[in-house]
Amino acid sequence: MPVLHIAAALSEVAPRRAPRAAPRRSRWRTLTLVVALTTATPGVANEPAPDDTPDLSAYWTRERKAVALNAGIVGAVGLYGFTMWGWGETGFEARSEGWFGRDTRHGGADKLGHAYTGSVATALGAALYRRWGYDEAHAARLGALSGVLLTTAVEVGDGFSPKHKFSWEDQVSNLAGVGFEYLRLRHARLRERMHFRWEYFPSPAVRHGRHEDITTDYSGSRWLLAFPLRAWGLGDSSLKWFELQVGYGTRGFARRDERYFDAARRHPFVGIGIHIPLVLERFGAGAGTRRVFEHIQIPGTALPLPP
């Protein structure tokens, strides 16, 4: 609206032939222009005195930020669970889902998904805490706390859902992922030598619009541990550009996948890949960017390729 007032005022104050009453009208439009400018332009007429501005930085100490973050995790998870996942529609119930057997619902891919979620939640939490001024050790502990809080809140909430239920196998996987990342954060040598990654390329069901949630698109996912060769004594060799990988994925377990796969299959694998963090380092990428690819595997940069 201030732009409209300015345009109208300028059109009225421009020289032109007009009746004698026009100047009065122009004064009203000019007044509108002044009001619009003083209310729309910061620091011209309505800037508060310095003493009137609350010092939020002094209030938001790193401790308060940590409390707010973890309270926000619980609140956001609860809100989403009650509105989207049907939490609270039944009493609490637990069930065993098994691990990696052929007769399980997802062939064990979901267990690696839980572990990966715990790992990434811990890494992201620790990064936030470091930014807020915590040292490496304290940030790692708080990151692990946030990772446990997030994954446990989801799993306990699932216990009150008519569809999912609480699974001890899921919770063990959650804690394993949190614990693994905590150890990586506390021990730089381990962090250099082992990366836990997710590789994703949309499955046929997603590409054809039959499924939308990529986090449960197990036929498009696989998870792996990568061992960069440069961290295992080969830093001066041309082999430093490569890494050994051990991983697992499944295909065709979901009903939506039946038309695209002839059978449900599990795919453990051992392979070799390009060490992307080193490539990025040579191109001048910062540490933050390189850390992302400690957790993400780019499709097509490792063999064997997914089935």
Residue ranges of model-derived segments:
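N-terminal targeting leaders of membrane proteins
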Residues: 20-23, 31-111, 115-134, 237-240, ...
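Residues that define the transmembrane beta-barrel architecture of outer-membrane proteins
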Residues: 174, 217-223, 264-268
